[in-house]
Amino acid sequence: MNIVILAAGTGKRMRSALPKVLHPLAGRPLLSHVIDTARTLQPSRLVVVVGHGAEQVQAAVAAPDVQFAVQAEQLGTGHAVRQALPLLDPAQPTLVLYGDVPLTRASTLQRLVDAAREGRYGILTVTLDDPTGYGRIVRDASGFVTRIVEQKDASPEELKIAEINTGIIVTPTAQLSMWLGALKNENAQGEYYLTDVVELAIEAGFEVVTSQPDEEWETLGVNSKAQLAELERIHQRNVADALLVDGVTLADPARIDVRGTLRCGRDVSIDVNCVFEGNVTLADNVTIGANCVIRNASVGAGTRIDAFTHIDGAALGANTVIGPYARLRPGAQLADEAHVGNFVEVKNAVIGHGSKANHLTYIGDADIGARVNIGAGTITCNYDGANKFRTVIEDDVFVGSDTQLVAPVRVGRGVTIAAGTTIWKDVAEGVLALNEKTQTAKSGYVRPVKKKS
């Protein structure tokens, strides 16, 4: 089977410099969703017709199995499909999809393809409570499709028809070339419409069959930011419903965004307004607090992530406790039972089993052993303005509050670092490290006061 995806439109109503089909839905271009669905049908040829912003669109979705045809002038859907003809296998049927209709299920398309076997012409239709603005499917007394009539050309009786054309079709490819060549542009837009092909197919004696989707929203397209937002919420609710079926507890299924792949174990609980991006895995008994953003991360069993935590490119072991207001950046690796608390940032660092950094700390480019306590206000000074250096803290170290560790530096096992200490040399095992200071108390001191006006 050939699949052609039309993606050449300008998208004027989007009011954006970005080509319409590249606007994101769930964090990925609209067109990428359509291509992924098309791939599940295992086409022999997959052709995307580009036009407006052609180079940008091609760069965004380029892949070995995707070919591109260019529609230099936007002269209608029929003209667009015609540009793809040289890339198609004439012995195979062709399914035509749209790059701005991202939610059509593969099962819906497969039913249409099955209905159109043996050289039939297939149309995906949908029945609407309010079909205003759409082309109507006109049938004869026996129920056979005779034509598609546009709203402006429909008679009062035809306007009562609730079954409408979605534009998605399956057609014999060998005949399609002839039918497209016979199209006329005698309409208000001066364009060649793919919908006109159905009458040519009927005149040529081809049986026209129809199929319908399970859900009306499968055929909704995007022509404005409002429609894009509507489809985003539909998609996210579908994702949420699937998570609920899998046993995930969602505090509010309407307030979760998954912009990638989210895999959850048993008894996972997710509070409101959480965003998951890229590939995220949550193991059994993970609890996510409200307003968290988690991207490309794995979270071990029994972990608790408190509210307003941001995690990006991190790996968390089992029974860790994170947040609230923590930030784990790429390369952060936490062993089992590690704690990273409020206003702590971890970047490209390993935190060992049972170690804790509970308050107001920056840990960057560091290797921290097991059972280490990092006091509030501790900073690993990892950057000299040009180069990054690592800090190594071995097992069972106690780091007092307001400590600076100037990398590269190693702190040996069992060391105690007093509060307010700056470490710039390696520290041997088991010692107390401190910067000796003198505390002075001056009697008779009078604090300055503001003069009253």
UniProtKB/Swiss-Prot annotation:
Subunit text: Homotrimer.
Annotated segments matching region Linker: 226-246
InterPro entries: Bifunctional_GlmU (IPR005882), GlmU-like (IPR050065), GlmU_C_LbH (IPR038009), Hexapep (IPR001451), Hexapep_transf_CS (IPR018357), MobA-like_NTP_Trfase (IPR025877), Nucleotide-diphossugar_trans (IPR029044), Trimer_LpxA-like_sf (IPR011004)
Note accompanying the cofactor annotation: Binds 1 Mg(2+) ion per subunit.
Keyword annotations of the record: Acyltransferase, Cell shape, Cell wall biogenesis/degradation, Cytoplasm, Magnesium, Metal-binding, Multifunctional enzyme, Nucleotidyltransferase, Peptidoglycan synthesis, Repeat, Transferase
Protein name per UniProt: Bifunctional protein GlmU
Top EC category: transferase
Chain positions recorded as acetyl-CoA binding sites: 376, 382-383, 401, 419
GO cellular component, one term: membrane
Source species of the chain: Burkholderia cenocepacia (strain ATCC BAA-245 / DSM 16553 / LMG 16656 / NCTC 13227 / J2315 / CF5610) (Burkholderia cepacia (strain J2315))
EC number: 2.7.7.23, 2.3.1.157
First-listed, main subcellular location of the protein, grouped into a coarse class: cytoplasm
Function: Catalyzes the last two sequential reactions in the de novo biosynthetic pathway for UDP-N-acetylglucosamine (UDP-GlcNAc). The C-terminal domain catalyzes the transfer of acetyl group from acetyl coenzyme A to glucosamine-1-phosphate (GlcN-1-P) to produce N-acetylglucosamine-1-phosphate (GlcNAc-1-P), which is converted into UDP-GlcNAc by the transfer of uridine 5-monophosphate (from uridine 5-triphosphate), a reaction catalyzed by the N-terminal domain.
Database matches in Pfam families: Hexapep, NTP_transf_3
